[in-house]
């Protein structure tokens, strides 16, 4: 399967990175995060999430393996046992996070706990797409050289994740005070 999305009425497959300065803004006074994505970005994210849900349920796409890393690198039998024990729980957690994102995608602000579900989904999407693009931790993108829509999407998800971490940082400060 391939990632797809469309914006606008012309039906063309395209992707536009949002012009908004910060996609998320932490509100420590309310223990919430403000979602500042424009409608097109929310539509793109929602479309990706729907495709991701289908991929998870189908469970045949090899790029999903990045979401379930092996616990035992040198013992496939132990790793299979571990996978049998945890796979269904991990899948359930991912599907529940998708549910949260889908239910809150159009809200202006969400509770921090719901935002952590957003972060999990965005990170999972980034990992799966990165696997498909054969991206490694050593890779650096030259923004002037990105012509592939999937690369643009990967970078956008990485930026969203970075901004999500920054926006939720106040929760770590509160945690460290206790």
Q: Where are these predicted regions, by residue range?
A:
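Long, charged, mostly alpha-helical binding arms that flank functional sites
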Residues: 97
């Amino acid at each position: 399967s391939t990632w797809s999305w469309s914006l606008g009425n012309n039906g063309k497959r395209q992707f536009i990175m949002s012009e908004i300065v910060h996609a998320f803004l932490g509100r420590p006074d309310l223990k919430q995060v403000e979602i500042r994505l424009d409608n097109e970005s929310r539509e793109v994210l929602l479309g990706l999430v729907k495709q991701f849900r289908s991929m998870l349920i189908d469970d045949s796409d090899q790029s999903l393996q990045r979401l379930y890393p092996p616990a035992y690198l040198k013992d496939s039998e132990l790793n299979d046992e571990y996978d049998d024990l945890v796979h269904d729980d991990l899948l359930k957690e991912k599907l529940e996070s998708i549910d949260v994102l889908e239910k809150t995608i159009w809200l202006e602000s969400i509770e921090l706990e719901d935002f952590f579900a957003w972060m999990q989904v965005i990170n999972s999407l980034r990992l799966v797409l990165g696997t498909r693009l054969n991206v490694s931790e050593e890779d650096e993108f030259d923004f002037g050289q990105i012509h592939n829509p999937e690369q643009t999407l990967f970078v956008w998800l990485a930026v969203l994740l970075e901004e999500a971490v920054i926006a939720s940082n106040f929760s770590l400060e509160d945690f460290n005070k206790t």
